[in-house]
């Protein structure tokens, strides 16, 4: 409760809290790795973080202070230790070289992308002549988001978390849903957005599409509320450029106007999600050097907060 009060104490008359109205929790579900972006159970809490009862208490405390909670939602891939992948792998290892999988025997084969050919982005399935798509690494097999069975699973999973009080979702690795196929990604984002908002119309969804602005802007046509605006982030982004003397205030303003015009062309109700740095980037304290570094960092954070949309810290 003490740390929540630092974020937002729920009292508008005080000025000792940050006044934030939303918390984004990075992956909290069971996982064999430190980062937990490879989930083994989508409907539980990793013991390192506590229990479901702890989570429910957190939600209640946050809501009492006017803080919304969104959770990281990793549906591009699961862990290779997830029961879905284990079942599919074990089944494929039983097949003869000329035998095709029977989805009635093992429906989980359709949950992932398997092939007997070594395709780009695929890795060998040990003990078999099969390969599976794993764009990040072999411990993160890519899920088949076109599969109706997979979509049904995520329908149930999102319902579970909404029933536990979450206010929305942060979608991880959006550009990897269908590598090199932006129209297919937009379709999958549309499905997810419509599915979630049919259950909670005011749910907030923000996507991570780590690419240039022109490439991810069309994803706004899906109805997803926000996408992180990478053009302003990191040590070489539009915010840092100004403070390094590589651009003017007019350039910064025009960049925002250009972004707003572009995003609105795909979704008039879009909400930009500007940020300065995140867990995948270097710490912002190292973006500057010299006696003005602290002041430059403060200015940068102020610029981020004053941008249009939902600013993430």
Role assignments for model-derived ranges:
Residues 1, 148-157, 248-261:
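A Trp-anchored, charged/polar loop motif used as the substrate-binding/catalytic surface
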Residues 1-152, 163, 174-222, 227, ...:
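Acidic/aromatic-lined carbohydrate-recognition and catalytic surfaces
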Residues 23-25, 169-171, 312:
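Hydrophobic residues within beta-strands of alpha/beta enzymes
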Residues 75-77, 155-180, 269-281:
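Active-site groove signature of glycoside hydrolases
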Residues 190-205, 244-313:
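Catalytic-core region of carbohydrate-active enzymes that cleave or remodel glycosidic bonds
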